[in-house]
Amino acid sequence: MSMLVVGMSHQSAPVALLERLSMDDTVRNDTCEVLIQKPSLSEAMIVSTCNRLEVYTVTNSFHTGVQDVVKVLASNSGVDEDELRGYLYVRYADAAAEHLLTVTAGLDSMVVGEQQIIGQVRTAYQLAAERGAVGPRIHAQIGRAHV
């Protein structure tokens, strides 16, 4: 079981596409529940801001995990899977953990060093934790990021 991040940001996708994928708290909660019901995924947390949408999961199968996340995002947004794949980035295992640290430090923000993102990640974590969607792996990574 390894951490997997599937996402897009202002650096990889046009704002119009990010807006189509944007999720309010209710949609985020529902999406986390759908994700953790997939056999390949055991934990899920979604960071959704005006500049990024990132799905943090724990998977037992890299390719199946990525495919499951993409299918759920396409279903939620109505955006075709092939279109999504053109803008998504994927990070796995150590690279996923490093990405979370980079994001929470504000190093991947439109304005480098901005601190609003740490609160947004904290909110995403709290929402997912309240729904029982996070477990020991995401919890440990959030702790390492000092969120």
Question: What does each model-identified segment do?
Answer:
Residues 83-146:
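Glycine/serine-rich phosphate-binding loop and adjoining beta1-alpha1 elements at the start
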